[in-house]
Amino acid sequence: MKIGETTPDFEAETTQGRIRFHDWIGNSWAILFSHPKDFTPVCTTELGYMAKIKPEFERRNVKIMGLSIDSTGDHEGWAKDIEETQGHAPNYPIIGDADFKVAKLYGMLPADIAGDPKKRTPADNATVRNVYVIGPDKKIKLILVYPMTTGRNFDEVLRVIDSLQLTAKHQVATPVNWKPGEDVIIAGSVSDDEAKRRYPQGWKAPKPYLRIVPQPQ
């Protein structure tokens, strides 16, 4: 799986019923994020925080889908612990990928994996802590893979989505540590003549290839 590739479509059981992935995305943006195993500490904090900030994703027209190789029944039982300890229960669908189908399809687990998922330890599933940001065109815009011992920064995922949505609409790029409302960079594909039409107020250019303008609205 690479940035720019079309995401594989699939059908799966989730905590909110059966879905076909591309149909579920529709014309929205989407996040598919996976975790190694239910009833584990780091994942508990992650899923609770994702539930807390779900309104921020909805405001950006982004749907959320979780995934692990546990059953949907396990997900539902674990949700009670998440709500008790984190203050928020998962309020988005979570795939029960007990046959490893989606994890294999997305390259999170080797294609020859088989057996009882309940017998697998979190370490066995260490490669299943991924984040995929997917555009309305069903293409991958961002891939993040985290180690077992490091919880994900979903605030950073929001920041990247802000950048992706801005740069999809305007021919700009966002610089290091950019936040919404800060200056952006005119894309290298835009000639100076075209930039003059787009930005008649001009731009700052410490180097010819570094053309800085206020964020377009």
Walk through the language-model features, giving the residues of each.
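Chalcogenol-based redox active-site neighborhoods
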Residues: M1-Q217
